[in-house]
């Protein structure tokens, strides 16, 4: 079937130039119309309304002019009006298709992130000690609460020898699978280095060198490592950017922030760290807490931080509580202070007490 316009055009061309007009292939034309409408829909979805309206108007004019020029110089004929009439519904379909394609892509990305977080959370949980070590003459309590599916905090107990116990508490910058892998690497490094005769400071120095090579740029570990001489009741510790421990001295009833020696930069930042040992001589009834910054930086609805002062006030009554009770008192106080406000950092604490 050939329309009257095409017949007239063909006859006119035959008479004037002896070059008949060629109708475009139906399949090609249908594909063109679909691509035309879909393309306009994509443009409408990707650019602002005023810009997309200008694009549609401009492309419509361009299409009309190109059709006339093709008819004149190439003798190629196809309906001009149909794409212009169908461009609105086809644009809507194209725009809707792009919208749902983006939504599906976002769904896949979110699903992958959730799977990564689940894997990271499982990995992190597997690294936490199942229970605190039982040592004659001492009491130990520990707890870690994640603010998200995958936290950045971790702690560990290392049986370096029959007479020595290592304690590690750290906070990794990345709270994802990569962060969990850094935790695993940190844990392995300290366990391995603790098997030798290195001092606490030298263990920290060697750990920093190894982690600096292994972890990617921009990630680091704020960590405190301590070694307890069980018989001598001496705790030797070294801090790399971790919060200051608090020591309750039973003999005087004082509560002291422990000042550590050295640079105290987190592991993975400096190539050569200048770490130094800090020694504490325990006496019966003494207690010391190690904790991450999620404790003191916990926020309430007024955007106030829990802070060191509140923590020190609790520690002033440490003599009245065993390590487990002291830990629960601190955690409950932080939770009561924060209320229903979602926290963005993990809460991790270790309490070490010397029996009377």
Short names for language-model regions:
Residues 109-289, 339-356:
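… and, occasionally, acidic/histidine-rich disordered N-termini of signaling adaptors
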Residues 278-290, 295-356:
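C-terminal catalytic subdomain
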Residues 1, 13-111:
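Transmembrane alpha-helices and their extracellular/periplasmic helix-loop junctions
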Residues 2-5, 110-113, 320:
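Hydrophobic alpha-helical scaffolding
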Residues 17-20, 36, 48, 66, ...:
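Hydrophobic alpha-helix feature that most strongly marks membrane-spanning transmembrane helices
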Residues 12, 173, 295:
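Active-site His/Glu-centered metal-binding helix of metallohydrolases
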């Amino acid at each position: 079937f050939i329309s009257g316009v095409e017949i007239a055009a063909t006859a006119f061309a035959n008479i004037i130039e002896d070059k008949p007009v060629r109708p475009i292939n139906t399949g090609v034309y249908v594909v063109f119309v679909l691509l035309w409408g879909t393309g306009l829909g994509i443009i409408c979805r990707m650019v602002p309304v005023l810009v997309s309206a200008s694009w549609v108007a401009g492309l419509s004019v361009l299409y009309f002019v190109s059709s006339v020029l093709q008819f004149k110089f190439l003798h190629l004929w196809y309906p001009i009006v149909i794409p212009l009439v169908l461009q609105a519904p086809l644009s809507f379909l194209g725009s809707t298709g792009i919208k749902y394609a983006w939504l599906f892509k976002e769904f896949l990305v979110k699903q992958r992130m959730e799977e990564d977080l689940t894997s990271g959370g499982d990995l992190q949980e597997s690294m936490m000690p199942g229970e605190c070590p039982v040592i004659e003459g001492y009491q130990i309590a520990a707890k870690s609460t994640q603010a998200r599916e995958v936290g950045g905090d971790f702690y560990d107990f290392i049986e370096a020898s029959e007479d020595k116990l290592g304690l590690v508490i750290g906070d990794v910058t990345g709270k994802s699978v990569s962060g969990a892998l850094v935790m695993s690497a940190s844990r392995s490094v300290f366990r391995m280095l603790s098997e030798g005769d290195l001092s606490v400071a030298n263990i920290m120095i060697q750990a920093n060198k190894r982690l600096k090579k292994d972890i990617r740029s921009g990630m680091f570990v704020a960590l405190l490592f301590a070694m307890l001489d069980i018989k001598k009741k001496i705790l030797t510790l070294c801090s790399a950017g971790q919060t200051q421990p608090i020591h309750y001295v039973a003999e005087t009833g004082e509560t002291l922030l422990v000042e550590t020696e050295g640079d105290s930069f987190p592991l993975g930042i400096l190539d050569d760290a200048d770490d130094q040992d800090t020694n504490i001589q325990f006496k019966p009834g003494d207690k010391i807490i190690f904790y991450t910054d999620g404790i003191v930086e916990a926020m309430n609805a007024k955007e106030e931080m829990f802070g060191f002062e509140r923590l020190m006030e609790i520690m002033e009554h440490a003599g009245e509580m065993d390590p487990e009770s002291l830990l629960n008192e601190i955690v409950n106080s932080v939770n009561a202070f924060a209320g229903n406000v979602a926290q963005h950092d993990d809460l991790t604490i270790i309490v070490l007490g010397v029996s009377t």
